[in-house]
Amino acid sequence: MSIDPANDSKLAPEANDATLGDVDRWIEQLKKCEPLSEADVEMLCDKAREVLCQENNVQPVRNPVTVCGDIHGQFHDLMELFKIGGDVPDMNYLFMGDYVDRGYHSVETVSLLVAMKLRYPNRITILRGNHESRQITQVYGFYDECLRKYGSANVWKHFTNLFDYFPLTALIEDRIFCLHGGLSPSIDSLDHVRTLDRVQEVPHEGPMCDLLWSDPDDRCGWGISPRGAGYTFGQDISETFNHANGLSLTARAHQLVMEGFNWAHDGDVVTIFSAPNYCYRCGNQAAILEVDDTMNQVFLQFDPAPREGEPVIARRTPDYFL
């Protein structure tokens, strides 16, 4: 699945004010888990916005590609993911949201992924998760981390403004539909997703909210979500949606699964979770999904990266996660 990066060696044309050298320097700095300066974050977000605003609500993605679930600020595990799956730009990646909150290094994690997007716009796709929102990040850690590392909320504002431009979903070779959460009773076609106005804070209800918050369920039909946003949807719903839209699979993230991936709805839906030992205590494996150039699918599972300088937390499984 290695790809010759020669055709993607130039910086996104919209990002010419940030030189190739600038962005390469940012990436190397971030790979050492060293946060960028506030001024560099501002420039990064300004230039990344110019790239992301050109992308679609249903962003087309070519194979081969590696599909990833939640990261949640677990920076060293993101480095492990690239070690297992291959580095950018040698491999194509599709991340399905939730880069921030809960982990210790949300700033470095989201900065690196956005810098990679700016440097190699055709090699990496970054979708929006329910945690890429102003309201959620004020509760679950990213806001506080920005205050602690920068002394003000400016970096948080730069990133949360940028989150409004992240694509909502992606479509691999017209066959695999990828999104953070799940389906919506308001949406029966990909064309409907394409018409949504995504450049806004994640709403509390409605189709955009549902795409980022919903979960598959064993019960048929639509159900009330215990999360307080989105819906649960049954096998009948996903089967109908996939068939109506010519899809072979809906891939999503959003839920902790102990093996890193979990099939549901008789193979119509798969959940991918890419944060091993979630919250540094859950004991789960992580996984990524490799889709090759013939659309064959292989899951790669991985364990946490060795930890340095982080507190050891006794493992326990919380009752519920957002």
Curated annotation (Swiss-Prot):
Binds 2 manganese ions per subunit. Mn(2+) 2 binds at residues 98, 130, 180, 254. GO terms for cellular component: chromosome, centromeric region; cytoplasm; cytosol; nucleus; protein phosphatase type 2A complex. Its cofactor is Mn(2+). Its EC number is 3.1.3.16. The active site is at 131 (proton donor). It holds the Pfam family Metallophos. GO terms for biological process: cell division; meiotic centromeric cohesion protection in anaphase I; mitotic cell cycle; negative regulation of G2/M transition of mitotic cell cycle; negative regulation of induction of conjugation with cellular fusion; regulation of septation initiation signaling. It comes from the Eukaryota. It catalyses: O-phospho-L-seryl-[protein] + H2O = L-seryl-[protein] + phosphate; O-phospho-L-threonyl-[protein] + H2O = L-threonyl-[protein] + phosphate. GO terms for molecular function: metal ion binding; phosphoprotein phosphatase activity; protein serine/threonine phosphatase activity. Mn(2+) 1 binds at residues 70, 72, 98. Gene3D superfamilies: 3.60.21.10. The modification Leucine methyl ester is found at residue 322. Keywords: Cell cycle, Cell division, Hydrolase, Manganese, Metal-binding, Methylation, Mitosis, Protein phosphatase. Belongs to the PPP phosphatase family. PP-2A subfamily. Retarded cell growth is produced by disruption of ppa2. Essential role in cell cycle control. PP2A may be involved in controlling the entry into mitosis, possibly acting as an inhibitor. This is Major serine/threonine-protein phosphatase PP2A-2 catalytic subunit. It comes from Schizosaccharomyces pombe (strain 972 / ATCC 24843).
